[in-house]
Amino acid sequence: MTKTLSYLKAVVICHGKSEKQMCDFIKSNLRIRIAVESDKKGEKSIQVTSVMKILNGRKFKTFQDFITTFEDVEICKIKTKKFLTDDFKIFIILDTDDCNEAQKKAFISKEMFRNHWAYRYIFPIYNNPQLESVLTKSHIKFEKRVMHENRSTLKFFLPTPNIKGEK
């Protein structure tokens, strides 16, 4: 039996600590090769209005910067030009409660990423207006932990009680 290489499948840019926690949970429990990126490990939130600063930062600015940072991404070559495979994705998970309607539309439609080299790989995921609302609408139980006046974090994927006979 031959081993196949396990390439990085996606990069997820997270709004804040709760989104990072959710992505880390998925990465760990489903054992998916993804890189979870956030500002200061989720301590500082990324807004719709500032996401381009991240994409124009040292990790994402150019294709070369990207493949230098994320060395285990699968690259295909056509003649002399290098590309990421069509299976690779950059997911950007952000709240839409901190921007105006035009910025929100530009994020959701990908218009704000049009001139970035990674445009074809970017897939915006938006919480309308924030993650709490989405979890509530989806009937996903969570606990809100207030850290201080303007900051809180969510604890979700709470264990559910076992039904008799299940282990």
Please give the residue ranges for each predicted region.
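Helix N-cap/beta->alpha junction signal
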Residues: 15-16
